[in-house]
Design a protein with these regions (language model features):
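Walker A/P-loop-proximal flanking segment of P-loop NTPase domains
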Residues: 1-46, 50-59, 124-126
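Defense-system signaling and execution modules centered on TIR/cGAS-STING-like, death/scaffold domains
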Residues: 1-17, 33, 110-113, 121, ...
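The catalytic "switch" region of P-loop NTPases
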Residues: 8-10, 148-233, 238-241, 259, ...
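Switch/connector loops and helix/strand junctions flanking conserved nucleotide-binding motifs
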Residues: 48, 77-80, 179-184
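Conserved catalytic segments around the Walker B and adjacent sensor/switch elements
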Residues: 61-78
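Mid-core helix/loop region of P-loop NTP-binding domains shared across ATPases and GTPases
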Residues: 88-170
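Winged-helix-like regulatory helical subdomains adjacent to P-loop NTPase cores
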Residues: 213-216, 220-327, 333
Length: 337
């Protein structure tokens, strides 16, 4: 079966070239075994969802856990209506559970629940009746805002002491930002500025970019399947241009293999990679456009503008620096940002 380089949504091993997703998060398995709650945060399109879906499937296949990844993104439409948001969220959770888990691991029931407690009551009942320890990964957590976000975080914190018999054995929140940067408009603040509604997390993790060897191995998969080679200098140029950012690594290769060099008998050169770069810049795909939109935020401009001007960075909050790092708009180097 042919395969492609993926630039949209989670990778699927049967149709996409991909690296081992769980190899990027080896520290999570022992953390889960210790009944911990944690946060995974990284920019969009670096493989968070792919990695956590794969980990959930591996944990379930081991026979030791009931593990599933669910999303709360549908609740983003109701920032000041937690009750409506909870109902919408639980509806999508049910669909995800029925898709990813075998019937014998499904919840025995989906209780109606009390307003402001629907998430915690559902998780509590499922944990009590599950034949295995329950592990939940909650994706797109930072798509929520205001009262809905606070309500769900507090429900998770409230249930934490009852684990593992009365609440999930282990739980992870997945998003672009760490907890303190979740957006909460109430009280006049744009951010939570505290981890207190989820101060039960034991650690925060982030997913880094691909290494040069990762890029080389990913492109080699295409060579092994089709016979078309990436010249060594082409791989080096791709890594130089992308710094290993997973979406960019795949986007360059996708543009080259599907549009610029479709004849597999012709090797992929530096010129091919450079042409693909120019096409991506001109096209302004959604991922790049959304990052450009972040540059208009005041706390982003306060850091990016001095860097571009070659000036010393002013006294800015560490949280703002971490925010830019999480978004992938800057990185730590030998001489600082």
């Amino acid at each position: 079966m042919p395969k492609w380089f993926n630039t949209a949504g989670p990778c699927k091993a049967d149709i996409h070239y991909m690296l081992s997703p769980t190899a990027r998060i080896p520290a999570l398995v022992p953390l889960i075994a210790q009944q911990n709650y944690f946060v995974i945060h990284a920019p969009r399109q670096v493989g968070k969802t792919t990695a956590m879906l794969a980990l959930a499937q591996e944990l379930t296949a081991s026979g030791e856990y009931t593990a599933v990844m669910v999303s709360v993104e549908v609740g983003a439409a109701f920032p000041e209506q937690p009750d409506i948001a909870e109902g919408a969220i639980l509806g999508t959770w049910r669909s995800a559970i029925e898709h990813w888990l075998p019937a014998e691991l499904h919840p025995t029931e989906y209780p109606a629940g009390m307003e402001g407690q629907k998430i915690s009551q559902f998780l509590s009942l499922w944990a009590k009746t599950s034949p295995r320890p329950l592990v939940i990964f909650i994706d797109e957590i930072d798509s929520l805002q205001d009262q809905t976000l606070i309500s769900i975080l507090r429900q998770l914190r409230d249930g934490y002491p009852r684990r593992p018999q009365g609440f999930p054995y282990s739980l992870g929140l997945i998003g672009m930002r760490d907890v303190r940067d979740y957006k909460v408009a109430s009280g006049g603040s744009e951010r939570l500025n505290t981890a207190s509604p989820f101060n039960i997390k034991v650690r925060s993790f982030t997913l880094g970019n691909f290494s040069f060897e990762d890029v080389k191995n990913l492109y080699q998969q295409h060579t092994e399947l089709t016979g078309q080679t990436f010249l060594p200098e082409a791989v080096e140029q791709a890594f130089y241009l992308t710094d290993g950012q997973p979406w960019l690594v795949n986007a360059l290769a996708k543009e080259v293999t599907e549009y610029l060099a479709t004849d597999v008998n012709i090797p992929i050169t530096v010129d091919c990679i450079n042409q693909a770069k120019e096409i991506l810049i001109q096209r302004q795909d959604t991922h790049l456009d959304s990052l450009a939109e972040r540059l208009r935020e005041e706390r982003v401009k306060a850091i990016i503008q001095p860097i571009l001007a070659g000036q010393d960075l002013p006294d800015v909050p560490n949280d703002d620096i971490r925010y830019l790092l999480d978004l992938g708009l800057c990185k730590n180097g030998n001489q600082g940002l």
